[in-house]
């Protein structure tokens, strides 16, 4: 019943959800974080040693053109034309389906409305859409453990900050990079830069292919490449934005953990979980995301700031030699 109402009246339900759980102050804070991460990603693109100036310029144009959607739509959908009656479940579903089809048909021969959302506000998820070059963060993901307006920057940048950076990085991953700033399927990379990107991406594929997720079963580095690149970029970009924020608002050690350590702990906390062996096998075959455990244990060994935060050495089990680490978004800027 809930899924039916959610499907037929998604934004009407979303409007009630937002009124109860997502104050305007949270949206303002999120807008600032997104701006900070856009700046950090722009700085990182500018300082990449392997990318040419021509491709960098196009990448910056695409980044600047991002459409940002946070919390809920600026204008709520009008459901006044949908009649809900106390006659039968089937009749209400039929009327809602007709209403939805007519809503879509009304768009025929009209320009694409880029203000519309591809997710309802009550959805715990986020997305990047390459055909519209937009990033979207519904109100429901802007709750703990992802976002807490009462928490400090270490927690929020480590959790929702990485999600923001993750979605932004999708615009430049193995699939997103094939679209230009206007969402057109167009190659804007030089041939040499594309080759360098693919070489670096292959390091990621090989690393995840080597991970044994269950006895005799390995992760699929090719299937999960885009999401792994996005996690890799999201961590680096969010950490850079976090360190920049601390220049004007320094944080203290809490419960024995430095701000930098708490950033990475917040990230790990988001993906903490436990699933059955059968689900591990199913997700490994079908899901383009790595398993939660490996979104942490597979991503952090390629982040230099994580090594520095926890004093990781070659004697630690998660240590990966520098020449074996992924370096797609490795910047010349030292944080």
Predicted feature locations:
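Intrinsically disordered, low-complexity linker/terminal regions across diverse proteins
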Residues: 2, 6-10, 14-332
């Amino acid at each position: 019943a809930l899924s039916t109402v959610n499907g037929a009246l998604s934004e009407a339900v979303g409007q009630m959800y937002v009124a109860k759980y997502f104050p305007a102050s949270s949206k303002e804070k999120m807008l600032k974080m997104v701006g900070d991460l856009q700046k950090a990603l722009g700085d990182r693109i500018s300082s990449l040693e392997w990318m040419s100036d021509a491709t960098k310029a196009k990448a910056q144009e695409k980044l600047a053109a991002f459409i940002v959607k946070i919390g809920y739509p600026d204008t709520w959908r009008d459901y006044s034309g949908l009649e809900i009656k106390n006659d039968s479940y089937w009749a209400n579903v039929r009327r809602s389906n007709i209403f939805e089809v007519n809503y879509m048909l009304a768009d025929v021969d009209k320009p694409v409305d880029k203000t519309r959302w591809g997710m309802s506000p009550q959805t715990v998820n986020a997305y990047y859409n390459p055909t519209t070059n937009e990033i979207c963060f519904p109100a429901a993901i802007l709750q703990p453990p992802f976002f807490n307006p009462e928490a400090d920057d270490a927690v929020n940048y480590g959790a929702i900050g990485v999600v923001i950076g993750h979605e932004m990085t999708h615009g430049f991953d193995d699939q997103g990079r094939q679209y230009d700033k206007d969402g057109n399927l167009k190659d804007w990379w030089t041939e040499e830069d594309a080759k360098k990107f693919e070489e670096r991406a292959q390091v990621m594929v090989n690393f995840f292919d080597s991970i044994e997720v269950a006895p005799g079963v390995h992760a699929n580095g090719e299937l999960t490449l885009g999401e792994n690149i996005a996690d890799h970029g999201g961590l680096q970009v969010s950490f850079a934005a976090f360190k920049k924020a601390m220049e004007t608002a320094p944080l203290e050690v809490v419960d024995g953990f430095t701000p930098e350590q708490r950033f990475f702990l917040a990230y790990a906390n988001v993906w903490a979980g436990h699933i059955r062996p059968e689900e591990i096998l199913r997700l490994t075959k079908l899901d383009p995301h790595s398993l939660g455990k490996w979104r942490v244990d597979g991503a952090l060994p390629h982040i230099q700031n994580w090594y520095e935060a926890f004093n990781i050495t070659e004697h630690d089990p998660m240590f990966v030699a520098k020449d074996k680490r992924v370096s797609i978004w490795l910047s010349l800027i030292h944080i």
